[in-house]
């Protein structure tokens, strides 16, 4: 069967994303879910990557299959922009001591840095299982905080504004 290669790209402000849990039901009439979380299972590389919005190409380009995401940082999904930046050692752990105290200046405060400081593209490449070929598919996000544009294979699918809509 033909394998379909897809890329999902999300531009988010103050990101909090949760992808659907990986559950395959035994009932043939039940809906199937494929997890897009960043935690791999069974040796698969389920990684997301991220790049500052202003430093990346257009949504059409970065969401296209075959796009080379060189220089992108690993991202944690579900998580936040700050969570992924801490993971990549860009900023110190905010819950250690008083690292997150605004007066220390270790972690930029959105009030000082501006909302655009936390605008990032999040990207993931995945294959749709052959058992789902020809079927109507849904991308379900369990929480985007606060705004996102969703792209798939070079096409903008839509935008969201407001938590958990």
How should these model regions be labeled?
Residues 14-16, 41, 65, 130-132, ...:
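Generic structural signal for beta-strand residues in well-ordered domains
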Residues 1-25:
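Bacterial Sec-dependent N-terminal signal peptides
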Residues 17, 21, 32, 102-105:
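Positively charged, low-complexity intrinsically disordered regions
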Residues 33-54, 65-75:
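Mature N-terminal segment immediately following signal peptide/propeptide cleavage
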Residues 63-67, 87, 157:
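Disulfide-rich extracellular domains of secreted proteins
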Residues 16, 45, 64, 69-70, ...:
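A generic alpha-helix preference that emphasizes hydrophobic side chains
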Residues 22-32, 49-58, 80, 84-85, ...:
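Accessory beta-strand-rich segments of carbohydrate-active enzymes
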Residues 71-110:
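Aromatic- and Gly/Pro-rich amphipathic surface segment
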